[in-house]
């Protein structure tokens, strides 16, 4: 069925905020969407772990989440609702 309006609004706001991300931050987000762990990203993206952490902080701030766990929760819920493609 349909999502409760307040939950749908949270998802809408989260998805809209993705437009605030830089291309590099979007790439990091994609790695998370595809199920990669933070420890894998430096090798995949050819960047240092400190750069990944810097991007993470910026991603969390721009998307309005407090942690990677919260980010992954949004990703999982969007996947379950069939809305994950909206993050691309």
Language-model segments: residues:
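Basic, Lys/Arg-enriched C-terminal extension of HTH/homeodomain DNA-binding domains
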Residues: 14-15, 57-88
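Recognition helix of helix-turn-helix DNA-binding domains
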Residues: 35-70
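Short helix-to-turn junction characteristic of helix-turn-helix DNA-binding domains
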Residues: 32-36, 75
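N-terminal functional modules and adjacent low-complexity/disordered segments of proteins
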Residues: 5-6, 41, 79
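N-terminal start-of-chain detector that recognizes signal peptides
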Residues: 1-3, 31-32, 44
């Amino acid at each position: 069925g349909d999502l409760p309006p307040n939950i749908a609004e949270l998802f809408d706001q989260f998805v809209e905020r993705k437009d605030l991300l830089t291309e590099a931050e979007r790439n990091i987000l994609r790695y998370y969407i595809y199920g990669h762990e933070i420890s894998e990203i430096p090798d995949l993206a050819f960047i240092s772990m400190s750069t990944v952490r810097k991007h993470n902080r910026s991603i969390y701030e721009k998307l309005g989440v407090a942690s990677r766990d919260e980010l992954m929760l949004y990703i999982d819920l969007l996947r379950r609702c069939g809305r994950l493609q909206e993050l691309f």
